[in-house]
């Protein structure tokens, strides 16, 4: 039975407007049902003494929900918070403390750090120091099974949080916020990080906590900055969300990457000491480089524009290498079963798969001899992409989505397998989950890579790999080291979770006569003709 999610509210600077906040919470709960907790970041109290607070402190008024707040961010409100360990301020209102971890009975783990950054000695009561951040990091990250935390609460924003993300509006994230909090976020990997103080609402695109293809997939982080309560501009100050504690989640579900996930904005900050040193701003780089964090030794930089940046005397793309012997897939080879060919372009051709999973299972193949996508010249890649897009439109018109995979292992000529899956069979997420689940069962590390990534930035020519591309553009990649199951892609697609034809997992069990193959090829050519871009030339 699935774990029931917790329903939480997070709030920005209250600044003494307790009635406004709690009346709003009552309205929300009346409309949407009760929430489990309210988490307040930023300035909970206003600078002046407020009779409104006395009503709550004496019990004349009561918060309608269990509320947890951070400590002071200035001297004026420090007197409301006695001690570093936290305490009850009023019924249903609890001060968490200077720093620490709050773990609820559900297993939800909330890390909190009160105050603003300070390098002064002694550290003011309303501030935190590099030592505070270091002790928090050590306390949590020293555990051998540490994967991250559910929620991080801080009052200041982390510095550079806007890098690689959507616009943060009027807040310049390169010049505001705390570098110490940035480094803490790198270490703690919170699933949600809430902050305030800037009187602005900013929900950043989620960012990843791992380097693609260099580290195992990890959960993404969502950073949300909230405005001040009752602000005249009506900026969002209250954020509702549901969450299942990560300790209760299946790994595949936890590490599932949102479609709009970005690079980690603080990726240089993890290298900083736990001091108040400046974290250098991430350099402007091409998308492919920051997705994979490649050094010059590991991969080539792609130009950041679409223009050809080769020098005037640069070498022209080399011709494809000649096969060492007879090749079943070079179109000029006498070994090719030409009756299976259904379309021929300038650099590539389409052929029905021999022993296909379905009658319209096709292959995209280069006419010349290339072993893998990584080795293709630019003009061949362009036509491969054209075929992929055309096949997607073709299959969509027939009520199907297509899955594409390549296995560059124990093969001599590139074969891009394109398998249509009826829309009625399953959703794209089901296909993705099936690949991930079956990969885990076979100890295959299948990693998600960015949608617009270039395989050439991931694998070097000659490297063995397997990759899957879904109709949404999502891609899964495995770097093959040894003993990869040759039929893995077919086995997943033939499984009960997708096409439900497990008996067809091995192509050799699906072969038909040449007459039948010729009939299928004729039918495909006829059906595909309205989509055939080669006729436009």
UniProtKB/Swiss-Prot annotation:
Cystine pairs: none
CDD domains, per database record: MPP_CWF19_N
InterPro entries linked: Cwf19-like (IPR040194), Cwf19-like_C_dom-1 (IPR006768), Cwf19-like_C_dom-2 (IPR006767), HIT-like_sf (IPR036265)
Region entry Disordered, spans: 297-323
Pfam families: CwfJ_C_1, CwfJ_C_2
Family stated for the protein in its record: Belongs to the CWF19 family.
Protein name: CWF19-like protein 1
Organism: Mus musculus
């Amino acid at each position: 039975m699935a774990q029931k999610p917790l329903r939480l509210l997070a709030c920005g600077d209250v600044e003494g407007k307790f009635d406004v906040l709690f009346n709003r919470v009552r309205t929300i709960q009346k409309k949407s049902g009760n929430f489990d907790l309210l988490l307040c970041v930023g300035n909970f109290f206003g600078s002046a003494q407020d009779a409104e607070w006395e009503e709550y402190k004496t019990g004349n008024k009561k918060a309608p929900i269990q509320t947890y707040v951070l400590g002071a961010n200035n001297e004026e409100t420090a007197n409301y918070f006695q001690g570093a360990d936290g305490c009850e301020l009023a019924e249903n209102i609890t001060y968490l403390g200077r720093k620490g971890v709050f773990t609820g009975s559900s297993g939800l783990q909330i890390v909190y750090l009160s105050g603003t950054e300070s390098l002064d000695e002694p550290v003011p009561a309303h501030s935190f120091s590099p030592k505070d951040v270091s002790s928090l990091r050590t306390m949590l990250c020293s555990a051998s099974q540490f994967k991250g935390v559910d929620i991080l609460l801080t009052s200041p924003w982390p510095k550079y949080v806007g890098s690689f993300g959507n616009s943060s509006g009027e807040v310049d994230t390169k010049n505001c916020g705390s570098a110490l909090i940035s480094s803490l976020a790198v270490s703690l990997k919170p699933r949600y990080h809430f902050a305030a103080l800037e009187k602005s609402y900013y929900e950043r695109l989620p960012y990843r906590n791992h380097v693609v293809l260099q580290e195992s997939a990890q959960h993404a982080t969502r950073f949300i900055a909230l405005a001040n309560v009752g602000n005249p501009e009506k900026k969002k100050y209250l954020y509702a969300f549901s969450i299942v504690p990560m300790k209760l989640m299946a790994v595949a579900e936890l590490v599932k990457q949102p479609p709009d996930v970005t690079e980690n904005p603080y990726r240089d900050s993890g290298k900083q000491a736990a001091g108040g040193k400046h974290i250098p701003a991430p350099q402007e780089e091409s998308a492919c480089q920051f997705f994979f964090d490649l050094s010059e030794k590991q991969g080539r930089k792609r130009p950041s524009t679409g223009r050809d940046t080769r020098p005037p005397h640069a070498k022209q793309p080399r011709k494809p290498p000649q096969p060492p012997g007879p090749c079943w897939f070079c179109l000029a080879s006498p070994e090719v079963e030409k009756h299976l060919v259904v379309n021929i372009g300038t650099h590539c051709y389409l052929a029905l798969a021999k022993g296909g999973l379905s009658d319209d299972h096709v292959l995209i193949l280069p006419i010349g001899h290339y072993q893998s996508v990584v080795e293709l010249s630019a003009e061949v890649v362009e036509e491969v992409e054209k075929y992929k897009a055309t096949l997607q439109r073709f299959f969509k018109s027939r009520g199907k989505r297509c899955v594409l995979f390549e296995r560059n292992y124990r093969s001599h000529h590139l074969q891009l397998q394109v398998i249509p899956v009826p829309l009625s069979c399953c959703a794209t997420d089901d296909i993705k989950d099936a690949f991930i689940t079956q990969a885990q069962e076979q100890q295959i590390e299948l990693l998600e890579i960015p949608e617009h990534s270039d395989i050439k930035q991931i694998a070097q020519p000659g490297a063995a790999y397997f990759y899957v591309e879904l109709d949404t553009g999502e891609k899964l990649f495995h770097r093959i080291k040894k003993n990869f199951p040759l039929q893995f892609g077919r086995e997943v697609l033939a499984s009960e979770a997708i096409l439900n034809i497990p008996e067809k997992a091995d192509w050799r069990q699906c072969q038909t006569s040449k007459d039948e193959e010729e009939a299928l090829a004729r039918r495909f050519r006829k059906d595909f003709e309205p989509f055939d871009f080669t006729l436009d030339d």
